Amino acid sequence: MTRAEVLERLRAHRPTLAERFGVVELALFGSFARDAATEASDVDILVRFDASPNWRDYFGAQFYLEDLLQRPVELATRDDVRAEMRPQVEREAVDV
């Protein structure tokens, strides 16, 4: 799967993610955002919810994305990203 394919799938399913899980922002980062993913790569996604997510929304969104992309997904809010990693993540993030 390529960066373009991941972005296309995420964009197509963004309304469902918003409706079912309260997702208001998505951004791709990591190896797929850099177009450097391998067969073993997971998909790194920054997410923002409309409210503080409960575990059903957070993990529901993660499992939905894993089914959609057929790969492991690392879902993170901006607050989850360690301070020393944040500048790199924000530089490479591709808004969906």
Question: What is each PLM-predicted segment?
Answer:
Residues L46-R48:
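Short hydrophobic/aromatic beta-strand micro-patches
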